Each structure stands twice: as structure tokens, then as C-alpha cells.
């Protein structure tokens, strides 16, 4: 559910010209990058390891596709393996490069909440997708919304409307939905 929501939101934003910035980790991060790529949009992956290391290993195809139509960036030198503490540290770069941070999935203690709190400290906007009140993976999102720290969104248009005054040309297009069958497939998936 969460990965599909992330992919749909990224797809809709990229169809209107936004750039998706995420961390290329398994789960929601990868889904966000996939949505951007499927929309034919730009995406930037901020890595918690050196550029020469693929983490997680199953994302090799995703790294290649992001590099072809976006960017892979890292503050870590080549040869630096992914370490658990790298990810919360790199999240400041993700939020710092972004106009807004969108939280789709967040347990009470998570990297997504670290990114959201960093974004707030940096004066950036934060949005969150609400979830079932008894779902552990929605507790962080629901708390951000309840505390007034994040705007409630249900799709990409909720985000785009917030920036209509700044980017009116981005809002003029028709509302787009993630199609059931998508034109984009990772090279590895095509084989």
C-alpha cells in the first residue's frame, strides 16, 4: 500500500515537472524513484554510501536508470560501504535539496521522521499521507498531521496546489493518474 502511494505521488508530481529526491533505499524510496522514472521525469538519489557501491544490491537497475535520467549523489567517498548511521545523516541533504518533504510511511521512530524534522528545521514544507490509526507504519504520518507539522495530502495535486502561486504553469495541466500498465520498465525487468 505505502509503496504504491509513493509511486503514484511521485508519478503525478513528475508529470507536472517536479523533480523527486529520495534515498534509493528499499521500499518507499525506490517506489518514489520508480514513479518518477515511469513518468519520464527527473529524480535524484542521495546515497548513504559511495557512488561505486549499490545498496541495496537489488537496486542495481534502479541506480543505472536514475543515473541515465537524473543524478546519484553522495557525500561519501568511493569505497564507503553503507552504514546504518549514514542514512539519518544523508537525510539532511534530501530535505535541503527539496522544496518540500512528503512522508508516505513512518513508524513512530523512522528515517522518514528524521527527514521531516530536519526539513522543518530548515524551514521547508512537510506533507504527510494519513493512514489507518491502528497501522504502525502510519503512526508517524498521523502524528505529523495531528501536531500541525505536516499538511495532509492524498495525492500529488494536494502538493501542487500548495505551490500554485509560485509555479502556476505547473498546475495548468490535466490531473494525471498512475496508469495500471506503465510504459516504463527497468531494463532488468524487461529481460
Spans of model-derived segments:
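Glycine-biased, small-residue-rich flexible motifs in mid-sequence functional cores and linkers
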Residues: 3-191
Amino acid at each position: 500500500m505505502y509503496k504504491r502511494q509513493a509511486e503514484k505521488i511521485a508519478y503525478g508530481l513528475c508529470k507536472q515537472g517536479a523533480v523527486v529526491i529520495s534515498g534509493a533505499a528499499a521500499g518507499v524510496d525506490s517506489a518514489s524513484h520508480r514513479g518518477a522514472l515511469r513518468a519520464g521525469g527527473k529524480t535524484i538519489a542521495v546515497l548513504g554510501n559511495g557512488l561505486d557501491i549499490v545498496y541495496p544490491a537489488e537496486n542495481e537497475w534502479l541506480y543505472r536508470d536514475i543515473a541515465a535520467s537524473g543524478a546519484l549523489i553522495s557525500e561519501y567517498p568511493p569505497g564507503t560501504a553503507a552504514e546504518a548511521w549514514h542514512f539519518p545523516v544523508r537525510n539532511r541533504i534530501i530535505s535541503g535539496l527539496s522544496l518540500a518533504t512528503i512522508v508516505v510511511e513512518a513508524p513512530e521512530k523512522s528515517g522518514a521522521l528524521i527527514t521531516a524534522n530536519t526539513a522543518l528545521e530548515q524551514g521547508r514544507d512537510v506533507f504527510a499521507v494519513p493512514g489507518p490509526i491502528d497501522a504502525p507504519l502510519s503512526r508517524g504520518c498521523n502524528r505529523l498531521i495531528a501536531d500541525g507539522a505536516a499538511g495532509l495530502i492524498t495525492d500529488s495535486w494536494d502538493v501542487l496546489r500548495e505551490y500554485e502561486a509560485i509555479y502556476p504553469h505547473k498546475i495548468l495541466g490535466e490531473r494525471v493518474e498512475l496508469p495500471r500498465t506503465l510504459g516504463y520498465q527497468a531494463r532488468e525487468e524487461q529481460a
